[in-house]
Amino acid sequence: FLLPALNAPDEIYHWQRAVQVSHGQLLADRRKGQDYGGEIDTAALEFAQWAKSHFERPSAFSLTQVRQISATLAESSGMVRASFPSSASFSPLAYLPQAAGIAMARQLGGGVFEQLIAGRMLNVWVYLALMAAAAWVAPCGRRLLVLFALTAPALHLAASVSADPLNIALPALLFAWCLRLRLDETSRLTRRSLWGLGLMLVSLSLLKPIYVLLSGMALLVPVRHFGSARERRIFLLATIGAGLALTLAWNAAYPFMPGRYWGTGADPKAVLLHIIQAPRASLAYFFQSLQHQLPIMWIDGWGRMGGYPPPFMLNAPKALSWAALATMLAIAAFDGADRRDLRASAFMATLAVVFTCVIFLAFWLTFSPPGSAVIQGVQGRYFQLAFLLTGWALVCAAPFGAYCQRLVTPLFIVGLTLQMASLLQGIEAFRFYWTN
């Protein structure tokens, strides 16, 4: 209720995909030129178009206006063919919570506003449940994980119909489980646990294509849980291989290049040719982009609420963002694991770096306009899992051992206070919406 309708990043498009899934259509219709979509409620499409017109001006609207337009659209019956390729190209997995809420509200006679609220509520409940499960399962770094889960942008995304909450929470739970298994002295996983771990690894491929990389966290699980090194190899090859095959098959069926859709002029062939012909210049450009964009990604990922121009977007003060980063790094450094594990630390740090570089490379190839000073299109929310891996790597390294653990609780309180300040500032910025 406190966040403007369809205001989260790309929520307009996530809304249409969630509505489609709520009708049981898991696979979007495919058309020529990477144009995907399908039939959704006429009222749902008109609601999205109404909100989009306000975002593009930009022109503020109120909660009362949203309720009024919802009541008006109740007269718009039937289905209409819609195009929303930026979300229709994704699998339905990350839309199941929102779709369930939308379907329940529609079944109870609710209009588009009630459906939106129901979808948002179920989405945030599932997100919080998964992150709570991850914090319970994690053998170390729980305070860091809680802070990570409760940042203002994370809660803002969770309280929307975006696919991002599940994209964050499911891998976080997998990371926590793999770390617990690494420290668990149990001789072997049960068959049920093996199936559960395998399904989680395969499910990553249905979130985003590059998430197959994150299934590498299973390499941290010791041989003793599989019975033998051979059985471990078979399990990892089967699950990671199945995930890779699934993501390749999905993206072959629903190929999508953001630059073509958003009209940026991105040219993957030209970029690849430039990398081959001028590797040094390409590498320098790549690292220049990292150096320039990564600090912005933290500020954006920790302190931005809203996905459209003001008044529909707010950035927390930079000082607040940097103070939060310092606090979270201090917690990770001081709240060390009971047993220092430098191998796990190095592995997670490396995975975070590789994951980050692959994201930048993907946007360089598929989105960034030719001739741009740095790689464009990246957003802080894309790097949330890289931030989490980096923090957990620091926890496992335990640079200060147990000497500074008495400082962790005060730092945790400071971190929560900073995040509450950011969240309240965002809610206050949207006063124009929820007070009218």
What residues fall within each predicted segment?
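Membrane-interface alpha helices of multi-pass inner-membrane proteins
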Residues: 155-157, 192-209, 214-220
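Transmembrane helical bundles and short interhelical boundary loops of multi-pass, membrane-embedded
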Residues: 245, 249-271, 378, 404-436
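Perimembrane helix-loop-helix junctions
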Residues: 177-188, 212-244
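Membrane-interface helix-loop-helix junctions at transmembrane boundaries of multi-pass membrane enzymes
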Residues: 226-235, 330-353
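Membrane-lumen/periplasm interface segments of multi-pass, membrane-embedded glycan/lipid transferases
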Residues: 247-336, 436
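Short acidic/glycine- and proline-prone juxtamembrane loop motifs at membrane-interface regions
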Residues: 160-167
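Interfacial juxtamembrane loops and adjacent helix segments
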Residues: 23-118
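Transmembrane-helix signature of polytopic, membrane-embedded enzymes
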Residues: 110-113, 132-152
